[in-house]
Amino acid sequence: MIINNIDWLIMFVQSGSPFLTRSDGSVTLGMTDGRTKTIYLDDNLRGLMLDRVLAHELVHAFMFSYDIHIDIEFEEYIADWISLFGRDLVYLLDNLMQNLR
């Protein structure tokens, strides 16, 4: 996958993998590594949960790729919001653009 001319990988790893362990020791379902340009996902993710976790991690990949640095709590808020509502926003925009004028 390419974001802003930067190649990124998506890798599925086992639950509890070191790649899914945060700096505070907690384990997560997805992790984005800006150094290796890799999104790591728990290989047990399926369906809607996979969709939401991948959308969340893509936000982090876009932030890294466009060299955007904001407070981590705000970045997490944006990533969560987009994982929940981003697709609705884009579909609405597409529909509006097709029907304007």
What is each stretch, according to the model?
Residues M1-M49, S65-R101:
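Metalloprotease/metallohydrolase-associated module, dominated by Zn2+-dependent proteases
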Residues R52-F64:
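Active-site recognition of the HExxH zinc-binding catalytic motif
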